[in-house]
């Protein structure tokens, strides 16, 4: 008989025969009847058994969180809180759990995050914890669907590379046979090469690695990056694509994951588009009107971003950043080369992502390399792609975990990562 998922039991007729597999969450043995709470990845159901000698012997031997099989029938006349249960006819232990458990699943014991991460497999069994990742999955799926609808194709680029994407030193070195190599910070260079190849619109979802020695609640050293690049586009086109992709992702999560939001005690609304825009220089004016000193060419501090973000209720763009704080591939503004056709997407004081129109003229690209004091020879495969017809193009890269953290109002990005990699953690 095929397995029945718990969340489909209401679709069955009263009295229908079912087989449920799952974790035995808790058991209550009464005089004549026993009640077991069984959990699978779709929900929890009560199963009731008459206490005949053979059945009672099995139930008494089941440790919490053991894997069990329950055969029985759907009972929609149940007086249980859910109004439905399984009237069990047999139960068997598929795989027994050891006792005691390294981390409680249902008991109201508050463990700190480090303890939870050390026993992550147990932590993820909690409904409110696994809900984060079901929402994250739906968020990503909504973004993917939107990009497909806009004629993007999904690509997969190398994660072992010979040079830094942005020329920095924040790289994890690896030994690639007899050569030195690095884990890629971003698919940026390869996305742009694909514009020269005529792919027109591409996106990638994959790991990115940053060897930055931070240890904050907003940073990871390995994260999931959603990157796009689009031809015959500028920074305004890229911003429109970004805000609509995020809106699509949130719409899908809200539509598909109502129970998960409820289990987290969260109610969210889909953001309206377009998101507000404010230029870098307008931000400076705003800060100075509040009596805050700021020098052109500096990046904004968290406190300064908090001041700026207080003017907005949600997502907003800061545009036209100085060339000095943007990567070499960022297009300068034609009317003021001090500035660039670039943007950061912010949520209050938190940076969500950044993007820009890219340089497409090979001579300007070489000039930008020289300004940033980068060795062109280290990027020859990339530079060559600009010599034979590179279209104007723009794009962005978006961290999935940070977006999820913002959406759910969580205080630590590690909560949105199955197995976080940070300054101190590489296990599990």
From Swiss-Prot:
Region described as Aspartate: 188-191
Q: Binding positions for ATP?
A: 210-212, 218-220, 351, 399-402
Query: What InterPro entries is this protein classified in?
Result: Aa-tRNA-synt_II (IPR004364), aa-tRNA-synth_II (IPR006195), aa-tRNA-synth_II/BPL/LPL (IPR045864), Asp-tRNA_synthase_2 (IPR004523), Asp/Asn-tRNA-synth_IIb (IPR002312), NA-bd_OB-fold (IPR012340), NA-bd_OB_tRNA (IPR004365)
**Site positions for Important for tRNA discrimination, renumbered to this chain?**
81
- Top enzyme class of this protein? ligase
Q: Which reaction does it catalyse?
A: tRNA(Asp) + L-aspartate + ATP = L-aspartyl-tRNA(Asp) + AMP + diphosphate
Cofactor comment:
Binds 3 Mg(2+) cations per subunit. The strongest magnesium site (Mg1) is bound to the beta- and gamma-phosphates of ATP and four water molecules complete its coordination sphere.
What Pfam families would the database entry show? tRNA-synt_2, tRNA_anti-codon
What is any one of the record's Gene Ontology cellular component terms?
Answer: cytosol
* Binding-site positions, L-aspartate: 166, 210, 354, 358
Mind listing the GO biological process terms from this record? aspartyl-tRNA aminoacylation
Q: Where the protein is mainly located, per its record?
A: cytoplasm
The family database entries (NCBIfam families) matched by this protein are listed as:
aspS_nondisc, PRK05159.1
Free-text function comment from the UniProt entry: Catalyzes the attachment of L-aspartate to tRNA(Asp) in a two-step reaction: L-aspartate is first activated by ATP to form Asp-AMP and then transferred to the acceptor end of tRNA(Asp).
Question: What is the official name of this protein in its record?
Answer: Aspartate--tRNA(Asp) ligase
UniProt source species: Thermoplasma acidophilum (strain ATCC 25905 / DSM 1728 / JCM 9062 / NBRC 15155 / AMRC-C165)
């Amino acid at each position: 008989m095929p397995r029945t998922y718990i969340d489909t039991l209401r679709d069955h007729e009263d009295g229908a025969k079912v087989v449920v597999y799952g974790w035995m969450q808790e058991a209550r043995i009464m005089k004549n009847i026993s009640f077991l709470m069984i959990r699978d990845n779709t929900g929890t159901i009560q199963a009731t058994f008459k206490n005949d000698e053979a059945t009672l012997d099995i139930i008494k031997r089941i440790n919490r969180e053991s894997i069990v099989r329950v055969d029985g029938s759907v009972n929609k006349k149940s007086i249980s809180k859910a109004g439905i249960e399984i009237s069990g006819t047999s139960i068997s232990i598929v795989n027994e759990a050891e006792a005691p458990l390294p981390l409680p699943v249902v008991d109201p014991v508050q463990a700190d995050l480090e303890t939870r991460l050390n026993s992550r497999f147990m932590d993820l069994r909690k409904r409110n914890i696994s809900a984060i990742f079901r929402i994250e999955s739906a968020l990503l799926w909504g973004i993917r669907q939107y990009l497909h609808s806009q004629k993007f194709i999904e690509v997969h680029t190398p994660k072992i590379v010979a040079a830094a994407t942005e020329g920095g030193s924040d790289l994890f070195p690896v030994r690639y046979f007899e050569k030195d190599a690095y884990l890629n910070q971003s698919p940026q260079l390869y996305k742009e090469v694909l514009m020269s190849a005529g792919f027109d619109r591409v996106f990638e979802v994959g790991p990115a690695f940053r060897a930055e020695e931070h240890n904050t609640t907003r940073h990871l050293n390995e994260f999931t990056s959603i990157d796009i690049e689009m031809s015959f586009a500028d920074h305004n086109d890229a911003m429109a694509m970004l805000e609509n992709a995020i809106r699509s992702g949130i719409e899908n999560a809200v539509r598909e994951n109502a129970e998960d939001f409820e289990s987290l005690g969260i109610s969210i609304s889909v953001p309206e588009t377009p998101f507000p825009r404010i230029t870098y220089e307008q931000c400076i004016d705003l800060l100075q009107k509040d009596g805050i000193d700021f020098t052109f060419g500096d990046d904004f501090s968290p406190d300064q971003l908090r001041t700026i973000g207080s003017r907005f209720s949600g997502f907003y763009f800061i545009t036209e950043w100085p060339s000095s704080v943007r990567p070499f591939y960022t297009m300068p503004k034609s009317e003021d080369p001090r500035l660039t056709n670039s943007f950061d997407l912010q949520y209050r004081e938190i940076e969500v992502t950044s993007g820009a129109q890219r340089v497409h003229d090979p001579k300007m690209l070489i000039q930008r390399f020289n300004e940033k004091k980068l060795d062109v020879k280290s990027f020859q495969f990339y530079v060559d792609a600009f010599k034979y017809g590179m279209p104007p193009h723009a794009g962005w890269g978006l961290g999935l975990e940070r977006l999820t953290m913002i959406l759910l109002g969580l205080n630590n990005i590690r909560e949105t990562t199955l197995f976080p990699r940070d300054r101190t953690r590489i296990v599990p």
